[in-house]
């Protein structure tokens, strides 16, 4: 029997008087990649925000590993082995690559820290090559690798990725998605929010389509790729 890792149960959210999410329900099973696709302004990043408490859900529940975390503080949620790679990367630009990774592994024991950083360097050899370089001088693709690596330093059970392909060259996008596939093969549970619907659905076990704050469709990744409405709206026909 599949174990459910994360559930959004009829989650609504507001920015002031504007309702951004309307009774959104979805779930992610352990070991899955689940993707959420939708146009700009559909509410994808807002839904991720309700998991981390920004914004808080105005109604409904967010449940992680059987625990209702709807009203938890962000720091407490992160201690539950949840890590997020935010849209726009947000690396510490004046710190070196290795210092950025150290921030991600701040709570790790020293032996565990060395093990994690070695693993991240194996996933992203370029980070090892540039480990003493300041993050702000790196390319967008390298910064995205660093943002993912930093999140992985906390040894998460659930990894949240918000638009990891945004603004990147096609060859770098493929490298990022290849790494996401590797993480799934190693048993990590991944919630992928992505505008690049074609790449995301090829990778995903299951997917959801969000429009104007409503889930309008859900199915396997392959089925959504073949869906005529999805192809017309998000895959260029």
Swiss-Prot record:
Q: Could you say which residues bind ATP here?
A: 38-45
Q: Which SMART domains does the annotation name?
A: AAA (SM00382)
PANTHER family the record matches: HIGH-AFFINITY BRANCHED-CHAIN AMINO ACID TRANSPORT ATP-BINDING PROTEIN LIVF (PTHR43820:SF4)
UniProt organism field = Salmonella typhimurium (strain LT2 / SGSC1412 / ATCC 700720)
Question: Which segments constitute the ABC transporter domain?
Answer: 6-237
Please state what the protein is called.
Answer: High-affinity branched-chain amino acid transport ATP-binding protein LivF
The family assignment reads: Belongs to the ABC transporter superfamily.
Q: What keywords tag this UniProt record?
A: Amino-acid transport, ATP-binding, Nucleotide-binding, Transport
Q: What is its biological role?
A: Component of the high-affinity branched-chain amino acid transport system.
SUPFAM superfamilies in the record: P-loop containing nucleoside triphosphate hydrolases (SSF52540)
One BP annotation, GO? L-amino acid transport
Query: Which NCBIfam families does this one have?
Result: PRK11614.1 (NF008626)
Q: Which gene encodes it?
A: livF
GO MF entries: ATP binding; ATP hydrolysis activity; branched-chain amino acid transmembrane transporter activity
């Amino acid at each position: 029997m599949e174990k459910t890792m994360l559930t959004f149960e009829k989650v609504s959210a507001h920015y002031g008087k504007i309702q951004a999410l309307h009774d959104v329900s979805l779930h992610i099973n352990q070991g899955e990649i689940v993707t959420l696709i939708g146009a700009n302004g559909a509410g994808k990043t807002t839904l991720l925000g309700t998991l981390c408490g920004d914004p808080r859900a105005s109604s409904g529940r967010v449940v992680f590993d059987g625990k209702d975390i709807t009203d938890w503080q962000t720091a407490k949620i992160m201690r539950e082995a949840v890590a997020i790679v935010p849209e726009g990367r947000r690396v510490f630009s004046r710190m070196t690559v290795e210092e950025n990774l150290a921030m991600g592994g701040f709570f790790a024991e020293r032996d565990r820290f060395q093990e994690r950083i070695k693993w991240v360097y194996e996933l992203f050899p370029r980070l090892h090559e540039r480990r003493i370089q300041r993050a702000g001088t790196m390319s967008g693709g390298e910064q995205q690798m660093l943002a993912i690596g930093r999140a992985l330093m906390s040894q998460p059970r659930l990894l949240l990725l918000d638009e990891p392909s945004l603004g990147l060259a096609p060859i770098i996008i493929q490298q990022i998605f290849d790494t996401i596939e590797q993480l799934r093969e190693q048993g990590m549970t991944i919630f992928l929010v992505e505008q690049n619907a074609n790449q995301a659905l090829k990778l995903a076990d299951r997917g959801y389509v969000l429009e104007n704050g409503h889930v309008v469709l859900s199915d396997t990744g392959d089925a959504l790729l073949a869906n005529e409405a999805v192809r017309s709206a998000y895959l260029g026909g």
